[in-house]
A protein has these predicted regions:
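Membrane-interface starts of transmembrane alpha-helices
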Residues: 65-73, 126, 130-133, 195-199, ...
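Juxtamembrane membrane-interface segments in integral membrane proteins
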Residues: 3-5, 15, 19, 55-62, ...
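Anchoring transmembrane alpha helix of integral membrane proteins
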Residues: 1-94, 173, 335-354
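Short, amphipathic, aromatic/basic-enriched membrane-interface segments that mark the entry/exit
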Residues: 6-17, 137-140, 210-215, 232-234, ...
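Transmembrane helix boundary and interhelical junction motifs in multipass membrane proteins
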Residues: 39-43, 225-226, 236-266, 294-295, ...
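Hydrophobic alpha-helical transmembrane segments of membrane transport and translocation systems
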Residues: 278-354
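Generic alpha-helical transmembrane segments of integral inner-membrane proteins
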Residues: 22-27, 31, 43, 71-84, ...
């Protein structure tokens, strides 16, 4: 038995390339785990660099130098971003304030509706449970004002941090696009020599991350616009705010769609009650979600490695718990990394590719 264990260990853990891969993965994990907060601007710049690499490379192919291509792409991207912010942000902010001010009315209406449930469905709903839920919601709402004040005070520091990020991220993004090859060569020089296996995993992961980031941004935009059109046509309150939330919800696979459905349903109930308009909007909303999951995602992520839904959910929970927002955003690529490492892990010695 001991001999079998020793043979298994020699096959899988004595290869210099395996040791190099383990060192690289461990170093990357420690850096992200302990310094993810400090590195947030760099991570944001890397994500945007993946997104903008394609148009930059296209401009290079038609004759632009790399610095000029990076500059043109960055200027166009900044213009589109500023336009979207100045058009969308004021309306979203106003609708958010209106939603907060309407919360007491929504709670009272929901409470009145819930009080009728025990008499309408006595076998299914208990009056005591309804009262307990209503009291719990009321206590949560009463503490909302205090929470908003705390958030407002904390946001002063957040605004300063945001201002710094608005300077750092574009600068980092420009140099990541402009000096891509020089930076990759610098990274290669500090990596272990026996990195053939790590290079094999990186080639697969680099393409996966590229496809994932581009696909996820497109999915956010398409789902957000489609949802807004549905809400706007139906005349739903807070249409733009809710559509933006639905668009961002695609960042969290499965879980995000469930969470964002709650405010959509509550606002629709408050506005129309359980009537024809409510059911029309709810069905249209489900159609958008269904088209996203069954049509849009397969098209945008056709080149991604297939992962079981349970694996994706666990990845969101685990990596989100370790790295917060970035762990959630990169949950699928990180799960794919684990899968790629397992598949590439050698049982026999692999000659160094360098």
């Amino acid at each position: 038995m001991l001999e079998l264990l020793l043979q298994w260990y020699r096959r899988r853990f004595t290869d210099p390339q395996v040791i190099a891969l383990l060192v690289i993965l461990l170093a990357g994990f420690c850096i992200l785990y302990f310094f993810s907060g400090i590195l947030a601007p760099l991570l944001a710049a890397i994500v945007l660099a993946y997104l903008l690499e394609w148009p930059t490379a296209r401009l290079q192919r038609i004759g632009c130098s790399r610095p000029w291509a990076a500059s043109i792409v960055l200027v166009i991207f900044s213009g589109i971003t500023l336009l979207a912010v100045f058009v969308v942000a004021p309306t979203v902010w106003q609708q958010g304030n209106n939603l907060i001010s309407d919360m007491p009315k929504m709670l009272n209406k929901f409470n009145a509706f819930a009080q009728t449930l025990p008499s309408r469905y006595p076998a299914l709903v208990d009056a005591g449970i309804v009262d307990m839920m209503a009291e719990n919601l009321r206590s949560k709402l009463s503490g909302m004002g205090e929470s908003v004040v705390k958030i407002s005070l904390a946001s002063l520091i957040g605004l300063l941090t945001l201002a710094i990020y608005l300077i750092l991220v574009p600068l980092m993004l420009f140099f990541l696009l402009k000096d891509k090859e020089q930076m990759l060569n610098a990274v290669r020089r500090i990596l272990p020599r026996n990195r053939g296996l790590a290079g094999q995993v990186w080639l697969e992961m680099n393409q996966q991350i590229t496809n994932y980031i581009r696909g996820k941004v497109l999915e956010m935009v398409i789902v957000g616009i489609a949802t807004y059109l549905v809400f706007f046509v139906m005349g739903m309150n807070y249409a733009l705010l809710l559509a933006v939330l639905v668009g961002f919800s695609v960042l969290i696979p499965y879980i995000g769609a469930v969470i964002v459905t709650i405010p959509v349903v509550l606002v629709a109930l408050f506005q129309w009650g359980v009537g024809a308009d409510f059911w029309t909007l709810f069905i249209a909303y489900l159609v958008v979600q269904g088209l996203d999951g069954n049509l849009l995602v397969p098209v945008l992520f056709s080149e991604a490695v297939n992962l079981h839904p349970l694996v994706i959910i666990l990845s969101v929970i685990i990596f989100g718990g370790m790295w917060g927002f970035w762990g959630v955003f990169f949950a699928i690529p990180l799960a794919t990394l684990v899968k790629a490492v397992i598949h590439a892990w050698p049982e026999e010695f692999i000659p160094d590719a360098d």
